[in-house]
Amino acid sequence: MFGEAFSGVRFTAEAVWGARYGTTQTDAFGAAYPYDRDLKVMEAFADRIFRPGPALVVVRAGRFRTPFGISGASDHAYAGFLRAPLIRYDNYWALSNNVLEHGASVTAGVPRFLVQATAGLPADTGAAVRHSGLDGVLRTQVSLRGVIVGVSGVSSKPYMSPRFARGRMQFAGLDARWMNGGVALKGEWLSGQPFDGTKTTGGYIDLTVHRPALGPVTAVARAERLDYTVNNPRAMHAVRYVAGARIRLLDTLSLQANVIRQSGIPNQGRSAFDLAATYVLRFDSPRSQ
């Protein structure tokens, strides 16, 4: 739900419920939302835009996704992939797509360049919930000739048990996006530590193709890896390849299918097939006169 409240203040509110059934351990169907059988508020925030001269300033306050890298829900949900990237999944020693902030952010920029600074307290959902404490996120973004490149940094409390997870969770990341003629590429690379004495590096690159010749089909492919280095058996070196499609059957109904080949992921086989159907309902309120 979104709209304008008063005097140029915009609001966004989102609630979700998801459930995963079965005894097999999997990271399927967690692209942008938790599947823990609880109804919860994901985002609830207000924005105010200011335009001093050629610049643009956006002030945001409330509960919102941690603005690190490619972090929007629409960047990952219902886009053709049924699993989050490895560096964006709960419990894979990186930065989950379910990390959120209770706080405020200020974004300031001119055409083709912006800087965003955020301060808040963790408000995470899902399995990887950070411990309470002030955290900060800084992101810069530049665009040139159809390419958008961003650099991000985050410092926060870890989400693992304080019995062994000392220090802070700190990551730096690089992301890029490009689109032309129905072909889009995007990807992220991340490096840092989930807590002291460990190191996580990894990234992914996504290809999306939606050309007139494909009709209702959007083809997708992903290549990714994640390396978690620690001096115990929990070290993880994972690789995953995904090929699939999003098929629009009706204006409100679509199918998504993924074929997966992977290695190095605990408790998961080398191959998988994911299939999902999405039905959309939309309600538009009449404009006030």
Regions found by a protein language model. Name each.
Residues 1-122, 132-134, 140-149, 206-212, ...:
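Outer membrane beta-barrel
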Residues 16-27, 66-68, 86-89, 120-127, ...:
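Sequence/structural signature of outer-membrane beta-barrel proteins
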Residues 34, 43, 142, 194, ...:
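Outer-membrane beta-barrel proteins and related beta-barrel translocases across Gram-negative bacteria
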Residues 41-44, 100-104, 113, 134-138, ...:
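Hydrophobic, lipid-facing positions within transmembrane beta-strands of outer-membrane proteins
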Residues 110-111, 142-231, 279:
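Detector for outer-membrane/organellar transmembrane beta-barrel domains
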Residues 207, 269-289:
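Outer-membrane beta-barrel "beta-signal"
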Residues 208-256, 260:
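C-terminal hydrophobic structural anchor segments
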